[in-house]
C-alpha cells in the first residue's frame, strides 16, 4: 500500500491529496509520475522519522527521475537524512550532488557550512587549531554562498562571519 494511503497526519494527507491531483492533471510520463510518487512517499516517511524507509524511496526516485532540478531536491533530502544520522561525509556528498544539478539551493550551502563549522569545533576540542581554522574557513565560504542566494536569511551565520572577521557586509 502506498505510504500516502496509510498516513494519519492532516497536513500530510492534504499534501498527498494535492500531489495526487497534480500527478493526474500535469502532463508527465509514467516514469516521472513514479519518481514523484517515490519522492512524495520519501518525504512522508522522513517527516515521521522513518529514515530507512525514506532513503529507500529517495533512492528509487533518483533511479527514475531524469530532470536535474527535481533530482537536486531528492539528493538534498538524502543529505538531510545523512546529516540527521550523523553521517556527515555522506551528507556532504549528497549536498554537493544536489548543488551540481541546482546551484540555487541556499539550504544545501547552509547545511554544508553547519557541518564544516561542527567539524571545526570538534578539531578545537581535539586541540588542533590549524585544522579547526581550515574547517571554519570552509564553513564561511559555504555561508557566503547561501547568503548571496538569500541575503535576508541566515542571520546567525552573518553574525558569525562578522564576529570572526570572515566577511564584511554593507
Curated annotation (Swiss-Prot):
Under the heading SUPFAM superfamilies, the entry gives:
TPR-like
Protein topology in the membrane: Peripheral membrane protein
Does the entry feature the keyword Chloroplast, yes or no?
yes
| UniProt-listed PROSITE patterns | TPR (PS50005), TPR_REGION (PS50293)
Q: Which UniProt keywords apply?
A: Chloroplast, Membrane, Photosynthesis, Plastid, Repeat, Thylakoid, TPR repeat
Cellular component GO terms, alphabetical: chloroplast thylakoid membrane; plastid
- Pinpoint the residue ranges of every TPR repeat in the record: 35-68, 72-105, 120-153
Q: Which Pfam families match?
A: TPR_1 (PF00515)
Q: Name one GO biological process term.
A: photosynthesis
Per UniProt, subcellular location reads as: Plastid, Chloroplast thylakoid membrane
Predominantly, its location class is plastid
Return the similarity comment: Belongs to the Ycf3 family.
Q: Supply the NCBIfam families for this chain.
A: PRK02603.1
Q: What's this chain's function?
A: Essential for the assembly of the photosystem I (PSI) complex. May act as a chaperone-like factor to guide the assembly of the PSI subunits.
What protein name does the entry list?
Photosystem I assembly protein Ycf3
